[in-house]
């Protein structure tokens, strides 16, 4: 079971971070579809308002991440 602080590999093929490793920021237990929030070192391509920075977190389902040691 993934928990906060776990290192995980992303299995969602359409994700920008597919096969990348990130750190679990939180796991929501309320029953939502994508409860695992993962933070990454690199940002994606979607900078906001002309800012050079993009998004570095994303939500995933439990079966879209695998914990690594």
UniProtKB/Swiss-Prot annotation:
Which Gene3D superfamilies does the annotation name?
A: 2.30.30.50
> According to the lineage, what is the superkingdom?
Bacteria
Q: Which GO terms describe its cellular component?
A: photosystem I reaction center; plasma membrane-derived thylakoid membrane
The membrane topology of this protein is: Peripheral membrane protein
* Key words of the record: Membrane, Photosynthesis, Photosystem I, Thylakoid
Q: Which GO terms describe its biological process?
A: photosynthesis
Primary place of residence? Answer: membrane
Q: Where in the cell is it found?
A: Cellular thylakoid membrane
InterPro entries named in the record: Elect_transpt_acc-like_dom_sf (IPR008990), PSI_PsaE (IPR003375)
What is an example of a Pfam family matching this protein? PSI_PsaE
What family is this protein classified in?
Answer: Belongs to the PsaE family.
Alphabetized HAMAP family for the sequence: PSI_PsaE (MF_00613)
What does this protein's UniProt record list under function? Stabilizes the interaction between PsaC and the PSI core, assists the docking of the ferredoxin to PSI and interacts with ferredoxin-NADP oxidoreductase.
State the name under which the record lists this protein.
Photosystem I reaction center subunit IV
Q: Which source organism does the UniProt entry give?
A: Trichodesmium erythraeum (strain IMS101)
């Amino acid at each position: 079971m993934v928990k906060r602080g776990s290192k995980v590999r992303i299995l969602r093929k359409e994700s920008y971070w597919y096969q990348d490793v990130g750190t679990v920021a939180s796991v929501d237990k309320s029953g939502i579809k994508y409860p695992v929030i993962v933070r990454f070192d690199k940002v994606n391509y979607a900078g906001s308002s002309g800012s050079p920075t993009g998004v570095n977190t994303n939500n995933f389902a439990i079966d879209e991440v695998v914990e690594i040691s």
